[in-house]
Amino acid sequence: MAHDILIVDDEPDISGLVAGILEDEGYSARTARDADGALAEIAARRPNLIFLDIWLQGSRLDGLELLDIIKREHPEVPVVMISGHGNIETAVAAIKRGAYDFIEKPFNADRLVVITERALETLRLRREVRELKQLTQPHTMVGRSSVIQQLRATVDRVGPTNSRILIVGPSGSGKELTARMIHAASARAQGPFVVINAAAITPERLEYELFGVEEGEGRERHRGALEEAHGGTLFLDEIADMPRETQNRVLRVLVEQTFSRIGSSEKVRVDVRIISSTGRHLEEEIAAGRFREDLYHRLSVVPIRVPPLAERREDIPDLVDFFIDLISQTTGLQRRKVGEDAMAVLQSHDWPGNVRQLRNNVERLLILAGGDPDAEVTASMLPPDVGALVPTLPNGNGGEHLMGLPLREAREVFEREYLAAQINRFGGNISRTAEFVGMERSALHRKLKALGVG
């Protein structure tokens, strides 16, 4: 989408000229003649970049005073000062007060375009750095399973469409990551990605964070998530926890594309793509009267399901390797190699907390695993709640090694437990189980039937 640029100059010829040059380059331009007009434009919709005349003749505030207000309320917005001949010292002083750069009158169109491109690129890089500092997840789904390949293909198709998406999946499965992938695949990828988790915010606080608050007696203006996400994507996480009154206001935003801050009747227009998620069955919430059906249909133009980890067990080795690399880089913990027996147990676990639970267990394993740091992590070193899946010998000794051996090397007494665990590990896929244990598919079928393993 086109970047939104505000030009503030008391001379209409100058502001019109700047706006014309920028619009020819594909930008969206607005103008204001004085400080009050500029503040009104910024309040209505925060621009990506501001060109500001230093003097602003006839204005309540001059350019430097207005600059101070802009940098205090919107420190991330770059401001380029417009100066006349003889104002260079003042322009330099403006840079010391937070201006990004300055351009002299009469100015060269090429220089104007270059400064614009550079300022917007700086804005983009700062935003990326801020978002990367918050990220502790991969930028894409890790894994090669068919369900993940299908999910990636769906993201590639819906990302560029600008349609509203409803992501459905259990807690910890990667709903926010899927939303980030959709954002990255869209034309808004260089814009902000803002997250509001309805389950993590009290109902009283939710509207404050979502819509913001107008400046008034005893309170400062607060920009809400809708304004923060202008030009980008707003991710509404766990929308089933959103109060009905807030649902009503969100529906109006979707219908009218405008909203009002708390304490104000003034309409604010934003350009935001909304992606939402839930771990509940919204049809049941609608039937119980807890969620608006019309809002559901507005949000779920394209529904996407993120599978639980139990449906993609074959991705667990890739996920474990990824998390070991990530955790060792961010914490300084030594990398460890996970042995085949331990990996088999990890793949056999049901993981009710999904990918998030797996990550936490990998981190716990790196912290608590003793012994030679160069030695493989074995099943006996796994956390108790996961390692409890390892079968034991009748005499009470551990049988951890059995999970990593072909069937022909396992003792006959353990065939039933061994094969049941392996089938669970591979999600009921007989072909992959047969390949791992070293049997023909037909022979495995006969063995399972003889053992009574379903």
UniProtKB/Swiss-Prot annotation:
ATP binds at residues 169-176, 229-238. GO terms for molecular function: ATP binding; ATP hydrolysis activity; sequence-specific DNA binding. Residues 141-367 form the Sigma-54 factor interaction domain. The modification 4-aspartylphosphate is found at D53. Keywords: Activator, ATP-binding, DNA-binding, Nitrogen fixation, Nucleotide-binding, Phosphoprotein, Repressor, Transcription, Transcription regulation, Two-component regulatory system. Residues 430-449 bind DNA. PROSITE patterns: RESPONSE_REGULATORY, SIGMA54_INTERACT_2, SIGMA54_INTERACT_3, SIGMA54_INTERACT_4. Residues 4-120 form the Response regulatory domain. GO terms for biological process: nitrogen fixation; phosphorelay signal transduction system; regulation of DNA-templated transcription. Member of the two-component regulatory system NtrY/NtrX involved in the activation of nitrogen assimilatory genes such as GlnA. NtrX is probably phosphorylated by NtrY and interacts with sigma-54. This is Nitrogen assimilation regulatory protein NtrX. The lineage of its organism: Bacteria, Pseudomonadati, Pseudomonadota, Alphaproteobacteria, Hyphomicrobiales.
